[in-house]
Amino acid sequence: MLARNFLETWCEMLDWDELVRREGTAVWRTIYRLVRNQADADECFQETFVAALELSNRQPVRNWPALLQCLATSRAVDRVRKKLRRTKKEEISDLARAETMQPGPAQQAEAAERATKLRWALAQIPARQAEIFCLHELGGWKYEALAERFAMTVNAVGVLLHRTRKKLQDLLSLQGALSESLLKQRPA
């Protein structure tokens, strides 16, 4: 009973509406940039704030923007992985629209293909690596912030990002080689 009263008091002290107003746009952009689908983004957005509430019930939160960005990235990467598993060999064209400034159809198709390939490659690497990579490359997080968030040294973050880039390059090269091989095998 005492714990419940404390929990209710704690939740009342934190103005969730204000937190969502203040951080919601950044959280939404982070999620949508990865999932590229309104329905999936809506679900990830809700899951992010539910997870934040649950975490804040267990321990005090020092940096809400950082926590929300980490949770959002994690939820979005998980969603992409699940979607790729469900649609292993199907085209994921609704996921693959790249952010561009009024490109022509050819540039849109190329950007969509690159985005699809990157999402596929991100789904092949460990979740933590994908999360750190996305926070750095898409979220603009500095090595120091990543080191603090993931309890790593700054040097370890740099090494992990370097290895992740290399692994993604290898996966993308392999995928390109397989695609070319399949195209060559098709009868004319």
Which residue stretches match the model-derived regions?
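Helix-turn-helix DNA-binding module
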Residues: 123, 127-128, 139-156
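A short pre-motif secondary-structure segment
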Residues: 132-136
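Internal acidic/polar
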Residues: 86-111, 142, 182-187
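Σ70-family region 2.3-2.4 aromatic/basic alpha-helix that recognizes the −10 promoter
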Residues: 46-53, 62-82, 161, 165
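Arg/Lys-rich amphipathic alpha helix in sigma70-family domain 2
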Residues: 70-91, 111, 174
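Amphipathic, Lys/Arg- and hydrophobic-enriched alpha-helical face
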Residues: 19-38, 54-55, 122, 174
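A short, charge-rich alpha-helical start-of-domain segment used by transcription regulators
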Residues: 3-29, 39-42
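DNA-recognition helix of helix-turn-helix
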Residues: 73, 77, 150-179
